[in-house]
Amino acid sequence: MELDPDDVFRDEDEDPENDFFQEKEASKEFVVYLIDASPKMFCSTCPSEEEDKQESHFHIAVSCIAQSLKAHIINRSNDEIAICFFNTREKKNLQDLNGVYVFNVPERDSIDRPTARLIKEFDLIEESFDKEIGSQTGIVSDSRENSLYSALWVAQALLRKGSLKTADKRMFLFTNEDDPFGSMRISVKEDMTRTTLQRAKDAQDLGISIELLPLSQPDKQFNITLFYKDLIGLNSDELTEFMPSVGQKLEDMKDQLKKRVLAKRIAKRITFVICDGLSIELNGYALLRPAIPGSITWLDSTTNLPVKVERSYICTDTGAIMQDPIQRIQPYKNQNIMFTVEELSQVKRISTGHLRLLGFKPLSCLKDYHNLKPSTFLYPSDKEVIGSTRAFIALHRSMIQLERFAVAFYGGTTPPRLVALVAQDEIESDGGQVEPPGINMIYLPYANDIRDIDELHSKPGVAAPRASDDQLKKASALMRRLELKDFSVCQFANPALQRHYAILQAIALDENELRETRDETLPDEEGMNRPAVVKAIEQFKQSIYGDDPDEESDSGAKEKSKKRKAGDADDGKYDYIELAKTGKLKDLTVVELKTYLTANNLLVSGKKEVLINRILTHIGK
């Protein structure tokens, strides 16, 4: 069997810059949406975006979840979800508990990846809800029925799927009832409260998080202290930050749900070796990633299910299918050296530790241009190595107090490189935490990543024109007028991607109309036409071009149209014709070659060999 010898030691990903984008997140999510379907959810209303129109709390919850399901397909297509109504007339669950209805569609497990059919039918659930499911108060004192307890039980059973090591498990609870047992007798209320809180605690002990999305009445704010504070486990500090009023409007609720669903997830787990015999566990979070279209998935033409790719190796000599593990060869001194896949993996492994501390340097040694790619945020974890948090805090405090950053070796199966570990202190405001404490891992550049800036002027040897003080003053005034306050790159969605997803959504859900996408990257014409901005622009133009900015300099136009003769580039610094005759063009730098090409209006793109050939062609050699 013939294999390419040069391919033996080739990395799976030869571009080290791509390893950031191709990191696989360590876990997926299992999510259960719990929706209160009591009559109170249908009676209570709040103002909608449209004037003179009211929306029920049930409609708000359903709309938020429908939007979240569509976002799941785009952002986290591997996540699995389930939808569960409680306080219902009908029941549908494996435990056969009253007042709980698990909504699903055929050919799908109770908790599974969201499908187009699930989203389409859930979008229409309000039209058929009263007929097929029905609303009914499920907490009845005389019968000892407790639909909230049953819903937590059913949700916990649904979340048994998957391991905590590979998945995060969450419940999202939508309700407008802040005291579900308020109308009960004291003894019954205490008993139901105790059993329900115990059921919630049992779920949390299994690693399941419960998050509340409350809906407030127009004339009454949701009081979380009556019951749900204990159910979701809020302490006094967290209670002050919890804002139940966010559920008053549909858009607020959608925004709140989006923030909770798209929480930061672990991009990778790292073992940080501080010294021999001492290592701690860190979780790495990707702070910034490019938004790209999803990868292509091949489907079976008959079942429309993803196809499973199987690969077989066939011997070219015998035609037989290779059963044994494939070995690779590397020619060495007229011999073919055999390597197994495991041996190659060990050869390419640079170090056993993932991240190893080398030393410390002053923060002044770290320059802005050293940060060439998005950094990774590191935070300690005691999940595997007990005491990691304590050691991390001691290191973090010392680095901040001494104004030092750590230099570490980041290797393993990834291309090796040096990284800078910069401690970040916690930033708080009146509304709570703005930035968490932790360490930013900055990927330091290789030596050839840092290059001198090329200074290219129209006339080599002539000083570049400098702006006057008045021009600088006018430019600063213009920038102040055009400054975007509280700017964040997250405010602007990629318009091409948004349209791409809108088209996919319309095709998958058989929608007649394409969802309108707004291009936030277009200039703000209304803002640019403000009198103060227009005045600043005109003053800047006048300072640069004078009273008549449209008049072009004749001398400038003539100078631009002139073509310099071959060999006259760089004011005689080099005789390019002579260098071409003697074959010494290769001794010039790329910048010097581009100077000749620029002077003769030739292309300057390509490698050094391409530039030399282009000069030789122009000279006629």
Curated annotation (Swiss-Prot):
Compartmental location: Nucleus; Cytoplasm
Domain Ku: 273-471
Matches recorded under SUPFAM superfamilies: SAP domain (SSF68906), SPOC domain-like (SSF100939), vWA-like (SSF53300)
SMART domains: Ku78, SAP
Function: Single-stranded DNA-dependent ATP-dependent helicase. Involved in DNA non-homologous end joining (NHEJ) required for double-strand break repair. When associated with KU80, binds to double-stranded telomeric and non-telomeric DNA sequences, but not to single-stranded DNA. Plays a role in maintaining telomere length. Acts as a negative regulator of telomerase. Required for maintenance of the telomeric C-rich strand.
Lineage of source species: Eukaryota, Viridiplantae, Streptophyta, Embryophyta, Tracheophyta
Induction remark: Up-regulated in response to induction of double-strand breaks. Down-regulated by heat shock.
Gene Ontology cellular component terms for the protein in this record: cytoplasm; Ku70:Ku80 complex
One Gene Ontology term of the molecular function aspect: damaged DNA binding
Region (Disordered): 1-21, 545-569
Domain SAP: start-end pairs: 585-619
Gene3D superfamilies per UniProt: 1.10.1600.10, 2.40.290.10, Ku70, bridge and pillars, SAP domain, von Willebrand factor, type A domain
Name of the protein this chain belongs to: ATP-dependent DNA helicase 2 subunit KU70
Effect of a null allele: No visible phenotype when grown under normal conditions. Hypersensitivity to ionising radiation (IR) and to methylmethane sulfonate (MMS). Longer telomeres.
One example of a Gene Ontology biological process annotation: DNA recombination
Compositional bias per record (Acidic residues), positions renumbered to this chain: 1-20
InterPro entries (UniProt xref): Ku70 (IPR006165), Ku70/Ku80_beta-barrel_dom (IPR006164), Ku70_bridge/pillars_dom_sf (IPR027388), KU70_core_dom (IPR047087), Ku_C (IPR005160), Ku_N (IPR005161), SAP_dom (IPR003034), SAP_dom_sf (IPR036361)
